[in-house]
């Protein structure tokens, strides 16, 4: 009897991607985050769709429409908080996923890696535009500050900012277009994720050792489907604990005040997942320099395959590189903390040192450590 899952044009694709896919036998829980990101995306699209049914993208009614969702719509409060905190879970999974790629040398698959970087940018853009939609104080001023950064671009900067705003300030036109883009982007992200997967399946997955696993493969189903389901259950558990017990933990109290262009909040800061980049931006006194550092702090990931000087792919057997990797993680946590602090002593100097350390680690110290480890292998 012919197996339909192996012959049907559509089922064949699903079968080759999620069922009969040959996977390394030794991939750890760090490989769970790809599937978790997929679940996060589906969850965000579904909750977002139901929110869009009740939301109005107009400056006069946006804030009250969100209030209406939370107070009057059946289970509107849980949909809204699942969407808001789902974004936080999304970024936690993203950072873990990227960190895994850096640690185990997954960036050697350059096409997969570069599409991943594009996905990261697209997700950050989507989250930023989504944060503007409730039209609270932090929404308005966050949008004003971040879009204004583009005015640092020589010659075309000012025109570009006014073009994005659709006027001379963040207003009705800005909110409407941000809603339109925020709605369409997740579907673009989903399409890019499929391309990401397509390129990954050209080479097969990496594994913790960084050594070819062609000699020892196991089918994705049932082994990794079960493993992924466990990850999904833990993700949903964490999300629901956040949503049901402390839904506003990661939000900003200022966003419960309707947007007022005449009143600037004392501390304008983005959501927690952008704070590390915001700290790097603020650590440079020059506007254009800050914007460049901000973009490069993420774009530097594209250089990872070029900066890899080690004879080994993974950091599993490279203690010096491991040490530097965890220093980098600590540095990013420091930057995240600094990004949420006011611009005053000693936070300014800590932020500047942490920013220098960030670029120094990636561009200089880690490639040097790899070279040292290569020489140690000769002993």
UniProtKB/Swiss-Prot annotation:
It is found in: Mitochondrion inner membrane. It is a multi-pass membrane protein. It holds the Pfam family Cytochrom_B_C. Its main location: mitochondrion. Heme b b566 binds at residues 97, 196. Heme b b562 binds at residues 83, 182. The keyword Transcription does not apply. This is Cytochrome b. It comes from Cephalophus silvicultor.
